[in-house]
């Protein structure tokens, strides 16, 4: 029996339509991607709210001069980075900064108190530039994503930001605008979702 051309045409048309439908993303897929992207951006913004706060930024200077206070004024006594990020021999950071806050003098303290390496200078950078420097192994101490998460969520010096002690006048130092637990979650989620830096 000879098959009429019209039937062949209809059969091919139906098959083509089915193939197209099978390979067309569903609306729900778009919604899921958009939701995931928005969630990642929220985590990024929350993380950056902390990294650009004085508690972090004061120890990530671009001029090798540690900063102090909410106004980020230069460290008293003419302190500077020194060759190993710990000041100079006669004025080493741990001369005053011990492993914990001094509630009598108001001098802050945490384990291995020091300036961040010069390669991690964030002062004056945009959020995007900070993120790029954070992820670049040439500037982040050759840390992998896993090591960065550990550093940012477990290192006592980083977490000091939420237990900064008091000023010499007895006033409490300002805390970052995000809670410690929310910051940790934001960091973990951002890296888990690929550490994507928003384009704007």
What are the residue ranges of the model-derived segments?
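A generic structural signal for ordered alpha-helices
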Residues: 34-37, 71-74, 165
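Acidic-enriched, low-complexity/disordered segments with a strong bias for Aspartate over Glutamate
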Residues: 42-45, 49, 63, 70-71, ...
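C-type cytochrome heme-c attachment and multiheme electron-transfer modules
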Residues: 54, 91, 101, 106-200
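Inter-heme linker and motif-flanking segments adjacent to c-type heme-binding CXXCH motifs
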Residues: 64-84, 99-108
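Generic alpha-helical propensity signal that fires on short helical segments
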Residues: 19, 24, 68-69, 74-77, ...
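Flexible gly/pro/ser-rich segments immediately N-terminal to CXXCH heme-c attachment motifs
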Residues: 42-52, 72-92, 120, 176
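Post-cleavage N-terminal segment of exported redox proteins
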Residues: 1-42, 52-58, 62-67, 185-200
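The canonical Cys-X-X-Cys-His
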Residues: 54-63, 90-100
């Amino acid at each position: 029996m000879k098959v009429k051309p019209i039937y062949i045409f209809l059969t091919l048309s139906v098959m083509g339509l089915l193939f197209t439908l099978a390979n067309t993303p569903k609306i729900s897929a778009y919604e899921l991607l958009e939701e995931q992207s928005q969630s990642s951006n929220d985590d990024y913004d929350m993380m950056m709210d902390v990294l650009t706060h004085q508690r972090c930024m004061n120890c990530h200077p671009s001029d090798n001069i540690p900063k102090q206070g909410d106004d980020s004024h230069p460290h008293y006594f003419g302190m500077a980075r020194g060759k190993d990020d710990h000041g100079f021999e006669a004025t080493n950071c741990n001369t005053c900064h011990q492993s914990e806050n001094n509630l009598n003098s108001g001098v802050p303290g945490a384990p291995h108190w020091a300036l961040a390496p010069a390669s991690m200078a964030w002062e004056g950078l945009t959020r995007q530039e900070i993120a790029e420097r954070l992820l670049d192994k040439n500037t982040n101490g050759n840390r992998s994503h896993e090591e960065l998460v550990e550093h940012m969520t477990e290192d006592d010096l980083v977490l000091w930001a939420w237990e900064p002690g008091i000023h010499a006048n007895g006033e409490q130092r300002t805390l970052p605008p995000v809670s410690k637990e929310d910051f940790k979650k934001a960091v973990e989620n951002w890296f888990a979702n690929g550490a994507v830096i928003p384009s704007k």
